Regions:
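Core segments of alpha-helical transmembrane spans in multipass integral membrane proteins
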Residues: 13-18, 40-62, 77-84
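Cytosolic, membrane-interface loops and tails of multi-pass inner-membrane proteins
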Residues: 23-40, 94-99
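Membrane-helix boundary connector in multi-pass membrane proteins
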Residues: 65, 84-105
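N-terminal signal-anchor/start-transfer transmembrane helix
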Residues: 7-30
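Juxtamembrane helix-loop boundaries in multi-pass membrane proteins
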Residues: 35-50, 72-75, 99-113
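Hydrophobic alpha-helical membrane segments
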Residues: 72-90, 110-117
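Juxtamembrane boundary at the C-terminal end of a transmembrane helix
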Residues: 119-130
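Alpha-helical transmembrane segments
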Residues: 2-14, 69-78
Length: 130
């Protein structure tokens, strides 16, 4: 159970980190990746999704993971999709737009989240599916 809870904590911390960067640190996020001011709303929108998941995971850590498999399945599917889309974007024409600073973070971070969610689904299966 320690591996499961550690993975959940890492996912929660990561999501809260990105939520903060997107919602509170929008300007720094825009400047870091050269996305332009028009991206502010979408960045904040992404931040709200990260915040929602981060807060739900923190709640699960405090109350127990029994019956919460859907939360981690969603986390896995979303992160796996973003890994593919992020890789295509970082290695596609968007990355060549003047001023854009595409980095591997666009697919490496979601890949790590996907792996962590898979770890939770596998190591916590006995409790998650109860």
């Amino acid at each position: 159970m320690m591996i499961t809870k550690t993975a959940i904590a890492l996912i929660a911390i990561g999501n809260i980190f990105y939520a903060y960067r997107c919602i509170v640190g929008t300007r720094a996020f825009i400047d870091q990746y050269g996305m332009g001011d028009g991206s502010a709303f979408i960045i904040k929108l992404a931040g709200t999704f990260c915040a929602g998941l981060g807060f739900m995971l923190a709640y699960v850590l405090m109350t127990g993971i029994a019956g919460t498999w859907e939360l981690f399945t969603y986390g896995f599917v979303q992160a796996a999709l973003l890994t593919v889309v992020g890789y295509q974007t970082v290695n596609g024409p968007w990355a060549e737009v003047e001023g854009v600073k595409a980095t591997k973070e666009g697919y490496m971070a979601p890949a790590i989240f996907a792996v962590l969610n898979a770890v939770v689904l596998l190591t916590g299966a006995e409790t998650l599916y109860a």
